[in-house]
Structures are given as C-alpha cells and as structure tokens.
Amino acid sequence: MRGEIGSCFYRGVVTEQQIKMESTRAGEWELLRQRHLRAEGERPESSARGIHHLALLSSDVERTIEFYQGILEFPLTELFENRDYLGSTHFFFDIGNDNALAFFDFPGLDLGPYREVLGSLHHLAISVTSDRWHHLRSKLEAAGVEIVFEHADSIYFNGPDGERLELLAEPLGEMNGRPVL
C-alpha cells in the first residue's frame, strides 16, 4: 500500500486516538444504518434515471484528451463551445454504461489547482474488468502516472489537472465484494 501523508490515503502508524475515533464512528455508522438504511425490497425507487454527465475543469483541452482517450481509452464523443461561457470548450468522454465524463476549459479565468474541500469531488471511481484494469494500469505506469494508493484491485492516481481518479476491477453496484445498490 502506498499513501500520502496529509491525505485520506495515508496508511502509516495508527495512533490510539485514531483507534478510539474509529470505535466511536462505528457506533455512529450503526445508528445511521438503523435510522436510514432500508432493505433492498423496502427502498423506494430512485427519482433519477442516472448520471447524465459529471463535469470537471481542464486547463489544457489537448492534454486532457490525450490522457482520457489516449491512456485510459475513454472515447471522446463530442466537443463544442460551452453555452454558459463564450470561448470555453465543453467536451465529453464515454465512460461506459451510458455515462459521460465531461470537461470545461475556462480561458482567461485564473483557476487554482485541484483542492479537496467540503462539497467538492473527492474522487471519481470507474469500474473496469480485471483484464482491462491490468492493461490500463500498465499504460498509466508507462506514461509515468504515479499510483497514489493501491488496495487489492483498486488504484488511485491523478489526472492531468490533479483530479483524483480510481480504477477498480469490481462490478458496478459493489464495494469490497459487498452490494451497495
């Protein structure tokens, strides 16, 4: 396992305070489950049809296309001017299962690097087959992309603008072999 100090991926020495916090949080999680979680047959149907697209920011359209289409093999499906910001590019990649990953560039705006703040995207987890996972991991390493964290058949790494991504060889609707949908 690899990790970064100061990030949620750090897996170093565990302190007594962390053990105490985990024990406290486990009790909180159980209360939340009892209060809000319903068995599969008892849950209402979702009002959503799915994710239309998730939009991230790009500082360099060409570099973003080379990374997502060239390395991760997500086909570019459309590119046009952003309707909300003249001169801005809005472009889309197919990430499977009728889901799109979109990007904007905002020329002329002074945007800072990716930061983890409340309400922001922590990471985007994308499911692939085991064979594809090994293939894409090799392509990432060959391209010099650092694997930030690894656990079993899951790897975390950063995209061209620091966006945190996860590739995992686990079926949709499962997490650590456990159904989540």
Please annotate each region the language model reported.
Residues 2-44, 50-59, 91-96, 112-181, ...:
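Vicinal oxygen chelate
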Residues 38-40, 78, 87, 108-113:
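A short, acidic/glycine-rich surface segment
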Residues 57-100:
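Core segments of cupin and vicinal oxygen chelate
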Residues 101-104, 166:
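Conserved beta-strand in the GNAT
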